[in-house]
Amino acid sequence: MRIAYIINSVEGGGAALPVPSVVDVLRRGGADVKVFALTRRDGRALPAFDAANLDVSIRQGGEKDHIAALRWLDTALSEWRPTHLWTSLTRATLLGQLVSLRRHVPVVSWQHAAFLKPANRLLLRSTQSLSRLWIGDSETVTRLTAERLAVGPDRLVQWPIFRADPSAPRCEPWRPGEILRIGSLGRLHPVKGYDVLVDALGRLGHTNVPYELLIGGDGAQKEALSAQAQAAGITSLRLAGYVGDPGAFLAGLHAYVQPSRSEGLCVAAHEAMQAGLPVIASAVGELPHSIVDGTTGWTVPPGDARALASVLARLVGNPGDLAAMGGRARERLLDRFSAARFENIGLSILDRMRRF
């Protein structure tokens, strides 16, 4: 079995994050896998790909030149001669489906995002029958794939893209006299809701325990967020830029916040739980299923700065409770997203693909 894993880009974050773990399982099941990226973007996923010894082919092109991308993909796949295509996200899926029609190769398609642009939703709904199997990366995305794309249960499976690592770095408990460190990881984009977080910080006001809030990530909103914080007189916020070692970043925190307007599974928040951090998150995607409200963290309505400020005040006001709460979050995550469970689901999908 030769699987061509087609992705939009090798950008750090997003759908590229789980590729090494997924390929590892497919290889363990006896498949030969090669990754085909339609464009490079920032290339920050490549160190992880290299560490996993992935075979990667990257097209030198942009994000809108779809005809050129289709020609490149068709040529590349005709040369590599896969037995199956595995696609991720809308562009890779649509182009992969077109190549599959020409090359008569079955397609398996991931869905990672809870939000789809209306045009993408219409396109995928019209072509969904071209993929033999659809995979949702979380409970929410799997349900939405069935509803929005009209994919029947016989062609839809759920494979959470997070594989827990018990050896990942863990955070240290907060101690009296320390600055309380709260953090977040994500691109500086409206969907991540960092403007809502800044609004919440402005509402928080004075706290008895000093704190700082670090956001690790780059993006087009950097200047706007800085200006918003400055206008609100917020001095506790630091935009730390891209974080190459998220495990070390998370291990240096006492709590984590994910104020997103939309998510699928949200790998970063689950990495935070893995590090033993309590998580405050918007109730979107998989997050309300992973967080036990008031026990392992808190959930708030997306876009609600007032509710977020209220929970932040509770967190900052009781820092001595955070370590125990984060410990419960970690235990629950290691059980729900164990490596054995991750591998078993992947191997069952691979067995199903052999029967196509």
Identify the function of each model-found stretch:
Residues 107-136, 150:
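A conserved, positively charged/aromatic
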Residues 37, 278-281, 291:
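Short hydrophobic beta-strand element within catalytic cores of glycosyltransferases
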Residues 87-93:
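Short His-centered aromatic/hydrophobic patch
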Residues 307, 314, 321-336, 342-345:
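A short, well-ordered alpha-helix in the C-terminal region of glycosyltransferases
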Residues 130-168:
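Donor nucleotide-sugar binding/catalytic pocket of nucleotide-sugar-dependent glycosyltransferases
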Residues 242, 261:
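Aromatic "clamp/platform" in nucleotide-sugar-dependent glycosyltransferases that forms part
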Residues 13-21, 184-203, 220-226, 270, ...:
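A conserved mid-protein helix/loop that constitutes part of the nucleotide-sugar donor-binding site
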Residues 293-294, 298-305, 314-319:
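Conserved acidic donor-binding segment of nucleotide-sugar-dependent glycosyltransferases
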